Amino acid sequence: MSNTHNIHWSTPSKRIYDASDIPNFKRSIAYYKIRHTLSVVIEKVKGCDLPPGILDKSIVTRKINNIPPSNTTHSRPLDLPPPQGEEEGDKCNISHSSNQTIRGEANESNYEGLLRILEVLNRYIDETPPLKGPRRFGNLACRDWHEKMNTKMNDLLKDNIKIHNSSFNSEFDGFIKELKYYIENSFGSAIRLDYGTGHELSFLAFIGGLIDFKLLSLEELTGSDILTIFAKYYDLTRRLILVYSLEPAGSHGVWGLDDHYHLIYIFGAAQFNGDQDKIIPPVQQILTRPVLDRYKETNLYVNAISFIHKIKSGPFNEHSPIIFDIHSSVSLWSKVLSGLLKMFEVEVLGKFPVVQHFWFGSSLYPWRDFETNKELPIYKRDEDEMDEDSSGDFLNGNTGIKTTKHNISMTGAPWNLNATQRQDDLNSTTYRGRQPRLGRN
């Protein structure tokens, strides 16, 4: 982290006001840093399993009452995966900087500190029970949870994220000022009482900020460590969805990949794209009960499908036709991964309803041109014209118009493209040899 004293920090602010701002977003340093973070995380978790016991099985197991009880694993002391260095050179369990399953001092404290933050936020759910009575668009107690989370977040970050570089001490307050926006916006909207792919994107950005400034080192953390962080995040957000009946944010309904998530499928598909000698389930068997039961605790993709089974009933091909199509027409996990990445570019990073709530600071995710490093134009609209956060009767955080396959723009199934049209698995997350300008340079 050289020249940290020259970094300018600022509270992130809105820059995407309507769909016409999307082209500028795709020219921004922020956009390339998001893609870079996604790319390096994918490479890290390829071929890796989650250690058993990290994911809370009750959250994806159907019961008469879909709300997980408050005495499940989320409220126990941290249950970190034990060292598992089975084979020398195993990137899932052994760090690059050592031939032992150990983390550097900074990574050990910050890895555990990050899990402690998620554990505290889980306890806040226990302390904030849902209000009694029917609620059509989410339970208002969720706003109390958000208020508590926002009030405590600054202290949570400072208490659990440790600096091991003295030159960065003077910059830490500014760093936290930018960073905390992204974690605070990772758990849904307190106003709209919804959760969706934009909030999932915000958590990726939060992790990217820690990686960027070496507060999490991918050279020392293992693939299983990274998966554990995301697994704990996903368990927390699914508890929020279940306990507070959160609406899907900007969902395409049955014509979308999933009501709430996209990245979880990318990471899970990457887990099935690693060591060629490792036994993995065939793509077209992934929806079968034996495969779901076997892999739902160790693979994020399968775990996400298990969650769908918990919250939805009826024929799978009717309520989740996109996922059903993947497992009816694709035979290779490499094609599943590349297709999901292309879909992410279009349906998440390319959609205004999703990225309008992604804000930009001065250093972590700047609104500056990737090629020239100059500020991108800002076309700010009047507040009374673009106030998307007003608490009206919106359907799924959008306009209230019923979504059908005829009135939304859809991404063609990328896994069904001709071979000549396909790119390599990570083409959508590489920069043709360029690296994003990081805020500390």
From Swiss-Prot:
GO terms for molecular function: peptidyl-prolyl cis-trans isomerase activity; protein tyrosine phosphatase activator activity. Residues 66-100, 421-441 are annotated as: Disordered. Residues 66-75, 421-432 have a biased composition (Polar residues). It comes from the Eukaryota. It is an enzyme of class 5 (isomerase). It catalyses: [protein]-peptidylproline (omega=180) = [protein]-peptidylproline (omega=0). GO terms for cellular component: chromatin; cytoplasm; nucleus; protein phosphatase type 2A complex. CDD domains: PTPA. It holds the Pfam family PTPA. Its main location: cytoplasm. Its EC number is 5.2.1.8. It is found in: Cytoplasm; Nucleus. PPIases accelerate the folding of proteins. It catalyzes the cis-trans isomerization of proline imidic peptide bonds in oligopeptides. Acts as a regulatory subunit for PP2A-like phosphatases modulating their activity or substrate specificity, probably by inducing a conformational change in the catalytic subunit, a direct target of the PPIase. Can reactivate inactive phosphatase PP2A-phosphatase methylesterase complexes (PP2Ai) in presence of ATP and Mg(2+) by dissociating the inactive form from the complex. Belongs to the PTPA-type PPIase family. This is Serine/threonine-protein phosphatase 2A activator 1. It comes from Debaryomyces hansenii (strain ATCC 36239 / CBS 767 / BCRC 21394 / JCM 1990 / NBRC 0083 / IGC 2968) (Yeast). The lineage of its organism: Eukaryota, Fungi, Dikarya, Ascomycota, Saccharomycotina. The gene is RRD1.
